[in-house]
């Protein structure tokens, strides 16, 4: 097995490391932690501009198809910077689920909005006290206008 990074993978790592070094200092992170949202919407938009939110998504959805190695490289740099944005939960977990839906209409619009940095996604897969039993969900989704209310 060859564990050396390709030139493209090295460029991805170097670019992410440089971005976080220049735009994600310790004091900025501290201020974000104290803010109402707890993360930077500006950084989320920059991640979209850099193509990071499309990383690993199907090309037919407008994504950047690649192996999980590239995603792991980026996740390592998010960890190194102690980045607060929901990259793993939104872009990786939810993005990969929506990108692989057999019915593109089911998640295509949400995936597009996430890859453009206009929204963040959340995976509701556990509930307090459910003991990992998916047969009895307590969460109920009710249509409200253009969206849904989760209760």
Where are these regions (language model features)?
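An alpha-helix initiation/capping motif
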Residues: 10, 37-41, 88-95
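Residue-level signal for inorganic ion chemistry
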Residues: 9, 20, 74
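Intrinsic disorder at enzyme termini
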Residues: 1-8
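Glycine-rich, Trp-frequent "lid" loop and neighboring beta-strands that shape
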Residues: 63-64, 104-151
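Internal helix-loop-helix
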Residues: 49-108, 112, 116-117
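Short secondary-structure junction/hinge motifs that connect adjacent elements
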Residues: 27-50
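Short alpha-helical functional segments enriched in proximate histidine and acidic residues
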Residues: 19-23, 121
């Amino acid at each position: 097995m060859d564990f050396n990074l390709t030139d493209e993978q090295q460029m991805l790592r170097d670019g992410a490391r440089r971005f976080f070094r220049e735009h994600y200092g310790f004091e900025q992170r501290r201020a974000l932690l104290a803010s109402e949202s707890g993360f930077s919407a500006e950084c989320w938009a920059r991640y979209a501009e850099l193509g990071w939110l499309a990383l690993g998504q199907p090309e037919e959805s407008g994504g950047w198809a690649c192996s999980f190695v590239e995603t792991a490289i980026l996740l390592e740099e998010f960890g190194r910077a102690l980045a607060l944005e929901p990259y793993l939960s939104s872009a990786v977990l939810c993005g990969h689920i929506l990108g692989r839906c057999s019915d593109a209409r089911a998640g295509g619009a949400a995936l597009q909005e996430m890859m453009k940095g206009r929204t963040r996604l959340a995976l509701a897969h556990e509930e307090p006290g459910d003991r990992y039993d998916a047969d009895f969900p307590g969460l109920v989704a009710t249509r409200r206008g253009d969206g849904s209310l989760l209760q």
